[in-house]
Amino acid sequence: MTEIYIVRHCEAQGNLKRLFQGVSDFDITETGAKQLEYLKKRFENIHLDKIYASPLIRTRKTALAVAGGRDIEIKDEPGIIELNGGVVEGKPFKETFNSIPGLAETWDNHPEDFAPPQGEKMRDAYERIWNTVKRIAVENSGKTVALATHGGITRCLMCRLLNGDITKLASTPW
């Protein structure tokens, strides 16, 4: 049986500052560094054949913690990178979302229709992550792997697994 562990990155600077991080390359905070230690301990007795990481510093550091110094291949996987926020990238959630008509309401109540200007549509990210995870599962049949990824991507994946329908994204927990 193939096993896939899904790990959201530890706290990053953008989380602390309440920014839309998206594909911006924010580093881990001091709290995030402590979380990395807990994560290392949590995975120390779990056999992993490979770890896939979104190619951002916060997920790479998370993947290294999951590996815990063991000789486990860590592979950059762009298919599990966070949603590209376009014009909202790296900006404060509240102020930015409220400055673009309809964006905050869509994010809160109909996230499946979220499509920031110059960014990635949520529906595209939803399909991207699902296709990536299916490919990884096939490539690692019978193995155990971990994915170091992001909150939005994890939520999309959980929605797909639990509900099978992106229209249920608003009711899918983070």
Task: For the regions a language model picked out, list residue spans one by one.
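Active-site metal-binding loops of divalent metal-dependent hydrolases
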Residues: 10, 144, 151
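Phosphate-handling substructures
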Residues: 69-130, 170
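Active-site-proximal alpha-helix that buttresses catalytic centers in soluble enzyme cores
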Residues: 7, 11-72
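Short, active-site-adjacent cap segments at secondary-structure transitions
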Residues: 13, 58-60, 82-84, 153-155
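Short, hydrophobic/glycine-enriched beta-strand segments
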Residues: 3-9, 147
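Glycine-rich phosphate-binding loop signature in dinucleotide/nucleotide-binding domains
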Residues: 44-47, 136-143
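Domain-level recognition of soluble alpha/beta enzyme cores
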Residues: 165-174
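Short beta-strand scaffold positions
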Residues: 53-54, 127, 148-149
